[in-house]
Each structure stands twice: as C-alpha cells, then as structure tokens.
C-alpha cells in the first residue's frame, strides 16, 4: 500500500537501516523455511541416506543454503518493480519455472542444446545444478576435487551479491526520484 510505504519512509530511521532490517527479516524467514525443508527432507528420505557420506550431504545442504541466498536476493530485486501480491506470485512462478528449466532442474544439463546451455550459464540455477552434480559424483574430499564445487558455489554467491547490489542501487534511485512520491490515493484523500 502506497500510504503505508510513505508512512514508513518518514520514520526517524535511515533508509539504509530500514533496508538492512527488511533484508535481515526476510533472510530469517527464508532460513526458517529452508531449515524446515531440510528437516522434512531428512524425515522423508532419511532412510535412503544411510550409505551416503555425511560430507556429501553437508555439501548438498550448504549448496542449497547458498541458493536460498540467491533466491532471496532475486526476490528483493523483483519486489522493487512489482507491488501487487497476485502479480508477485505470477512473476515468482514464471521466474522459478524459467530458471529451473534453463538451469537443468527439470531437464538434465547434458540433454540441453548448446544454445540453451550458453544462455543457462547466465543463470544462478545452472551453477547450483552444476555444483550439485559435482557433489554427488565426489569420491574423495581433497582440495583438487572440491575446487570446482567451491567455484560453482562462489558463482552463485556472485549472482546473489549482484542481485542485492542492483536492488540497493535501484531502491536508492527510486527514493530519490520525484516520481517515487507521485500523488497517491490514501485513506485521507480518497
């Protein structure tokens, strides 16, 4: 609601602090749901993990946590452009499906054509899937084998940092522009 946004922006805290608080709160909620998902996964598939190396399982969990950070950063960026709840849900579904397809979550990467693979390298899901495939193929855990996995995870963190940085810059530009405070119908003026 625009009136609520305007009321929050005139609070006696700096916009940077407000963004930090919003980001931390979003991160905490995301982490809570991530933990719940991991716990449910262990409850459902725990029996199948009996022979799995715990280091492999921990790397998979860590990779999924990094992807959570990517998803939260992307959602923060998208939320700057879309305000309505229904439209946000539609865009979230579209982005999730598009990134999942391009990143190899629906179709294995080796079945994708060269053109699609080239495009998918520009998505964080590609690097998540790539790291996951490398983690599941691990037979030893020295740096020579782990370096490609760490590289894929760092690329995901780079995407997260880029999304978050762009969101902060666009948020600042939006606050500073006069169109950010265009006449708005509130409860006071109808």
Predicted regions and their residues:
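Short hydrophobic, aromatic-rich alpha-helical segments embedded in or entering the lipid bilayer
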Residues: 109-150
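Short helix-loop junctions at transmembrane helix boundaries
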Residues: 34-58, 66, 80-85, 105-111, ...
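Hydrophobic alpha-helical transmembrane segments of polytopic membrane proteins
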Residues: 58-85, 100-103, 158-167
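Transmembrane helix segments
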Residues: 85-122
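Transmembrane helix boundary and interhelical loop/hinge segments in multi-pass membrane proteins
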Residues: 1-16
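Selective transmembrane-helix segments that form parts of the transport pathway or gating/packing helices
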Residues: 15-45, 61, 65, 69, ...
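Alpha-helical transmembrane segments of multi-pass membrane transporters/translocases
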Residues: 134-190
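Hydrophobic alpha-helical transmembrane segments
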Residues: 57-65, 90-94, 119, 150-158
């Amino acid at each position: 609601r625009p009136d609520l946004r305007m009321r929050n922006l005139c609070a006696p805290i700096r916009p940077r602090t407000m963004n930090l608080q919003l980001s931390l709160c979003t991160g905490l909620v995301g982490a809570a749901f991530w933990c719940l998902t991991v716990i449910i996964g262990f409850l459902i598939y725990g029996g199948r993990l009996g022979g799995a190396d715990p280091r492999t399982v921990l790397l998979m969990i860590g990779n999924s946590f990094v992807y959570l950070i990517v998803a939260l950063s992307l959602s923060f960026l998208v939320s700057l452009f879309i305000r309505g709840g229904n439209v946000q849900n539609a865009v979230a579904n579209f982005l999730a499906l598009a990134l999942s397809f391009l990143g190899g979550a629906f179709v294995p990467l080796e079945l994708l054509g060269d053109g699609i693979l080239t495009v998918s390298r520009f998505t964080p899901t590609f690097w998540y899937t790539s790291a996951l495939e490398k983690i599941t193929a691990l037979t030893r855990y020295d740096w020579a084998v782990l370096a490609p996995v760490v590289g894929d995870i760092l690329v995901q963190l780079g995407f997260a940092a880029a999304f978050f940085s762009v969101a902060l810059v666009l948020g600042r530009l939006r606050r500073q522009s006069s169109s950010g405070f265009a006449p708005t119908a509130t409860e006071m003026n109808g």
